[in-house]
Amino acid sequence: IDAGGQAITIHGRTTQQKFSGVVNRDGIARVVEAVGKHCRGAGHNVPVIGNGDVREAEDALAMMRKTGCAGVMIGRGALSTPWLFRDAWAVIRGEAAPPEPVLEAKLNIIRRYLGLMLQFRDERYAMTQIRRRISWFGKRLGKELDHRGRPVGCKPLRERVRAAVAPADVHAALDEFLAGGLRGGEMEVEAEV
């Protein structure tokens, strides 16, 4: 702070915990309190941003209420739920979170991700990233129910994207999934970490 820091982001886990266990919101609150005391004495304001275990919009609001932090940084939660920022902003403003995007909109997010990778990096890198990320994206796909009321899953889609050689292969797989194909297998559920 004394060296000119304008904000502090704190992840409420130790290095040893990595991604396991539950974020320590009490620890974040203690940092918020200590920074606040220091700043009041120095006559300036340095906001503390809390991070960890923000997977749903309500988690962001709970983080702010529990810790007193000025804002929330969202990390891994956004990998499977890219619209989490939109939802969290609504909930923090006291509004209801918007409905989850429809399947076509979710697939368009994957297409945009791939498009941005291609725009800013080369095709090899983009294809490596989309093959890695499809499992994260897949956690929110395939939530439609079959005739028995069970989630249909998207394992065949994930497998097809992982085997894709070119962007056109990814787009073809997404098109087929949207049309009702590449369904089945177990739904991937987000591990509680």
Spans of features found by a protein language model:
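Glycine-rich, proline-tolerant flexible connector loops at the mouths of alpha/beta enzymes
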Residues: 10-20
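Alpha/beta catalytic cores of nucleotide-metabolism and tRNA/nucleoside-modifying enzymes
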Residues: 1-7, 19, 26, 30-50, ...
